[in-house]
Each structure stands twice: as structure tokens, then as C-alpha cells.
Regions:
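Nuclease catalytic cores
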Residues: 23-32, 43-47, 51, 55
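Acidic pyrophosphate-coordinating catalytic loop
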Residues: 75-81, 134-135
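Nucleic-acid nuclease catalytic cores
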Residues: 99-145
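A short acidic/basic microdomain associated with nuclease active sites
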Residues: 59-76
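Conserved catalytic cores of phosphodiester-cleaving nucleases, focusing on short active-site segments
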Residues: 42, 65, 86-104, 115
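Intrinsic disorder/low-complexity segments
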Residues: 1-25
Length: 145
């Protein structure tokens, strides 16, 4: 299942430039974009608002992504749509989940790990725009560490 999922994303990105940035460099660029959004909007809005503004910021920085990506589950050879959706997958390397919650907690980390396992990606950024400072609302979840 996950190989087909990644192949689908690669096909989507085929019209864009080469993707040779390492995950660490991409995550820094994504975090920089989220800080810019947070600087202009501050905390207190809905997740979808922050997601839309983050998308705008990433586009302005020529960072390629897909938005609201369905993440299927394979069970006994059947691919099932269980309602999982990644907010963003950036350059087929970094999964981004936008949050506007009091605090990132274990359920958010578990969701990130589940999405990473289902997509064969290694890095998820949980971006909580409800934090007073964006750096305090940013959590890196890495699969396999």
C-alpha cells in the first residue's frame, strides 16, 4: 500500500523541480513559513485559517506540497479509506499537521506516527498555531528514532 501511495505523490510532483533538499532543510523552511504566518495572525484562529495561510506562504517560497492528502489503510490486501488525511505533504518528504489547540499532547503525536507509518515518510511537523510563540508550538515527530 504505502509504495503505491508514495508513487502517487511522486507523480503529482513530476511537474515541479527536482527534490533533493534533505528533510532537515525542508523542515527549517516549513518552520520559517509557519513563524511568518504566526507573526501576522497570532494565536486564536481556526486550524483551516492557519493551513490556508501556510499554503500561501509555502507557495510564495516555491516550496512544493500537496494538501489534504487522503491516507488509505491496507487491510488484508484491501485498500480502505478510513478518513485519514494529512494536512500537507511537502516535497514528498515531510508530513505537516496544522493544529490550533491548547497544547500538543500524546494523541497528536500518535496521529503523526500513524500517518508516518502509513505513508512510509520519516518526519512529521506538528505546528500548533495556538502557542504564544511558534517555536513552542512546533513538535518534530520522527519515525524510527
Amino acid at each position: 500500500m504505502s509504495v503505491g501511495f508514495i508513487e502517487f505523490l511522486v507523480q503529482d510532483f513530476s511537474m515541479f523541480r527536482d527534490f533533493e533538499k534533505p528533510e532537515n532543510q525542508l523542515s527549517q523552511a516549513i518552520i520559517g513559513a509557519s513563524i511568518e504566518v504566526h507573526k501576522h495572525l497570532g494565536p486564536g484562529l481556526l486550524e483551516k485559517t492557519y493551513e490556508a495561510c501556510l499554503v500561501h506562504e509555502l507557495l510564495g517560497r516555491n516550496i512544493c506540497f500537496v494538501r489534504q492528502v487522503p491516507i488509505p489503510v491496507t487491510y488484508k490486501g484491501q485498500t480502505l479509506d478510513c478518513g485519514f488525511r494529512a494536512d500537507l505533504i511537502v516535497e514528498n518528504k515531510v508530513l505537516v499537521e496544522v493544529k490550533a489547540v491548547a497544547a500538543i499532547n500524546d494523541i497528536h503525536r500518535a496521529q503523526a506516527l500513524t500517518y508516518l507509518k502509513l505513508t512510509d515518510l520519516r518526519l512529521c511537523l506538528l505546528l500548533n498555531f495556538n502557542a504564544v510563540l511558534m517555536r513552542d508550538g512546533t513538535v518534530r515527530v520522527v519515525l524510527g528514532l
